[in-house]
Amino acid sequence: MFSCDMASRWRELHGSGHWDGLLDPLDVDLRRCLITYGEMIMATYEAFIGEHRSPNAGMCRYRHADLFRRVDVSHPGWYAATRYIYATANADVHGKVLLRPLCREGRATECNWMGYVAVATDEGAAALGRRDIVVAWRGTQRALEWVADLKLAPASAAGILGPEGADGTDPSVHRGYLSLYTSEDQCSELNKQSARMQVLTEIARLMDKYKDEETSITVIGHSLGATLATLNAADIAANSYNTSSLSPSGETRAPVTAVVFGSPRTGDRGFRDAFHRLRDLRMLRVRNRPDRIPHYPPVGYADVGVELLIDTRLSPFLRRHGSESQSHDLECHLHGVAGWHGDHRGFELVVDRDVALVNKFDDCLADEYPVPVRWKVHHNKSMVKGPDGRWVLQDHEPDDDDDDDDDD
């Protein structure tokens, strides 16, 4: 999937020119770049333990050191996960978007694993043309019900917008998304720090570590994760976390780019305007035309960033009359990015991406293709037969950082 040109063009592909001339027709290197980041988001879905009966429900299956070797990404050696992100929220939000294990002894009863921070390895930095720091936010593959349920009043975004939030306009964002981003729980072993501070602390550490290298910060997400990525990217740029504290006068500022798929609206016009004024910040928002979630909330909120509009209904590989979940499915978005040529140019896969992937977690592929629906199932649902002949659930690899949300 990689092109040598992607390394030399990375600033252009990350929005230095606001993607002018790259979207119609869709640049082939940009297609590959978007799919690479989409796979890194997909890793959060593959690794999440969603079985309510598991005491590990809401956690990540894998140790962060092994994450990219255990999930389906094209270049597992290019990035290393350095920190996992855990989020909690207030009571109005918690039960609507966070998973609670049925087991009272579960570790994630009040919070969930929401993604990770990763950094390009030496191998990856050589291939990518710089040291890329990635923040990946997990979302939800569910269709409309979750976003329609979150009917909460807006809240001030001044706290995450720094000086841009103190200009008297009082920009606002969705209270539910802000709660997930900023809530902490001193009684939780995983969430004594908010998701926000977990990420910002790790980015500051990595920016100091790689202060002598060319760096970039890429914040990615799908669905609910896209809204968190939007808040996080604005926060990083507004509060200068894209500089090293060890650099004199913060003279070196890493570009911050948000890449999001199927994103609901995050804030009002004031937030949009403040976002667009941040000089180091860019955002590319991939929207699938039949997906209704990007139109929510329908009143009082504004779209942010540059939009790449695709329409997966033109794909001959997918069901002609797909469900709402199909139009919102992340793998379907990546399929669209691989083959979209515009409304009047047909659909042809420019990037050779396996069409079987669209059935990984959904029923999207046309019946003529012999691919089972929702085929991504862990062997025996992670039940393992022990030497005594009894079956036990083994769905979680203990990680040294599980209870270490204050380090570094």
Swiss-Prot record:
Keyword field: Cytoplasm, Hydrolase, Lipid degradation, Lipid metabolism
Residue numbers spanned by region Disordered: 386-408
Active site annotation, chain numbering: S223 (acyl-ester intermediate), S223 (charge relay system), D291 (charge relay system), H328 (charge relay system)
SUPFAM superfamilies membership: alpha/beta-Hydrolases
Record field: compositional bias (Acidic residues): 397-408
Pfam families, A to Z: Lipase_3
Any one Gene Ontology molecular-function term assigned to this protein's record: phospholipase A1 activity
Gene3D superfamilies: alpha/beta hydrolase (3.40.50.1820)
Cell compartment(s), UniProt: Cytoplasm
Cellular component GO terms, alphabetical: cytoplasm
Enzyme class: hydrolase
EC number(s) recorded for this UniProt protein: 3.1.1.-
Ranges in coiled-coil conformation: none
Stated family: Belongs to the AB hydrolase superfamily. Lipase family.
Function, as annotated: Acylhydrolase that catalyzes the hydrolysis of phospholipids at the sn-1 position.
Record-given protein name: Phospholipase A1-II 2
Organism per entry: Oryza sativa subsp. japonica
Source organism phylogeny: Eukaryota, Viridiplantae, Streptophyta, Embryophyta, Tracheophyta
